[in-house]
Amino acid sequence: MMDINEIREYLPHRYPFLLVDRVTDLDFEAQSIRAYKNVSINEPFFNGHFPEHPVMPGVLIIEAMAQAAGILGFKMLDAKPADGTLYYFVGSDKLRFRQPVLPGDQLVLEAKFIGRKKTIWKFECRALVDGKPVCSAEITCAEREL
């Protein structure tokens, strides 16, 4: 549904911090999104985390979920960063890690809108590998004008 060129229109992040490769499902009725991050051994963070046993840092899994949620928020508003608005990741609740994410894994990112108070948005997010949950959290984002 969204290739990397369209994703770059909705996220201000760039290499090495753009963590969404593809969006395959965007459901406005269910207010949800499904996106993918292909985890390659060539990711720069594997040089130090950990050289002999590479594991994707948990904070980057959280960031990937937040980026998917950000795309959903922009799409729900029919807006883009170029319009002068950004979403900042400001917190997480109910965070759980269940298994490590390794080079060669495909991270499935799912986010569902659960509420909004003024400029604060909440999303229920989870990340899966091979259909198994690896991380889940409620992600909070703040909508800010540039």
Swiss-Prot record:
EC number(s) for this protein? Answer: 4.2.1.59
Q: What is its main location?
A: cytoplasm
What this protein catalyses is: a (3R)-hydroxyacyl-[ACP] = a (2E)-enoyl-[ACP] + H2O
- Single GO molecular-function term? (3R)-hydroxyacyl-[acyl-carrier-protein] dehydratase activity
Q: Where in the cell is it found?
A: Cytoplasm
Q: Which UniProt keywords apply?
A: Cytoplasm, Lipid A biosynthesis, Lipid biosynthesis, Lipid metabolism, Lyase
Q: Which family does it belong to?
A: Belongs to the thioester dehydratase family. FabZ subfamily.
Q: What is this protein called?
A: 3-hydroxyacyl-[acyl-carrier-protein] dehydratase FabZ
Which organism was this protein described from? Answer: Pseudomonas putida (strain W619)
Classification of source organism? Bacteria, Pseudomonadati, Pseudomonadota, Gammaproteobacteria, Pseudomonadales
